[in-house]
């Protein structure tokens, strides 16, 4: 009778779960550090199920709950489904959770609003704080005599401000004896600082369980591990990838070694570079020593054709690109990229208020209207308008049909002008202020305008169709992706393109610093930012990984590559003369 082989990843996972259970039983806080493919969510759900089994009835009877705070709505839904929406557990996003708690304390919130960053002038212009209702709707800050509407980012900040007061800490601790925070490394910094300062350091209040991986911090500006005075539990499993890929991850991150489920599983991890290219390379502020965009594209296409011949199924292959200027031309928003050159986060992370409003409100609203999902449309708007007669409905239809037409045929400015007239929906204050500023500058030569006003004027002139395409990209509706858009995802095969075009990531420098370890105050933040994104990218494949570097690499950088991938898996691509 053949012996059943032990699953090393499962053994490591069980040991981590035992330590989580031990911490919960002893009543102390902990941090689960779960690398890529380790099954972080599985550990979190298992801990919740154990709490339900052992304390569920008692919690429900006492009116208390275990809070599970997630980073995304998708994670919230997944976890809630796994625990069958048990009444002893409150699963919600950081914004949903914080708002549900603080909305009970209207007077306290009103007193704190004036202390919020950049809000004092707005409040004073609107006549100050009285007895208005404080609400949180579309996520754009506004004040009038009836209500105060909070911004998206105000919610966790206000929560942190309330937790600074002992009265609210006591109420919070009474309601939530245990709090799990999913993706702790990406959770709002002020909220996490409040949790650390008022609960973890003092060892009072709720049991706090942090679940995440500080090497996968790619959304926030914090890239190093924050100081959490609690026990670390390392989960050294990788249920996703074959040994060939995990060996690269372990070489990159020896302090959290992972073991695989199937030690005999076949796969590959290879690195291709372009040092043999002798033609001119890029030399701009944001792209150094890279292949020209047309050469980079043909290089990628030829490599993919070769990989297909070698057995890759391209239907099961994800291309992760960082050369955003190349990607933009292929996806259909080159003018937006040109406008925000060097500041791509303005559209990729929706930091620009115009892009954010279009991507989060206008585009989803138009999609819902086009599909006749009117309930969804009004949900996006935040309220159902007063439609009391047939004429009201006809006016709505007329304005929406005109908006749909302008999306395809008009410019961004024409869409904004249409919304200024119809107020369906109303434009956020930040956009209205930019409009007023531009009107006040009429007749003034563009060279005399501020750079912000010049950029806004040029943004208005861009065809709105580019907004549709950039929104599709942001929402990952394309065959390509940048590394930011795939955190948490997995694919059979992955081709990672490391190139220039995004000033926050210097791949040749990253590879050099991994070897020399010469970190300074100047390069440290960039190093961690690039390292984390590189780790997230190369840890996505289940079976096959290929990395293509289109920038020239130094001998030091190539030494790092050989140490990570093995010299036998590193290849210099040849270019015809």
Q: Where do the PLM segments sit?
A:
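The feature marks helicase ATPase cores and/or their adjacent C-terminal helical subdomains
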Residues: 1-577
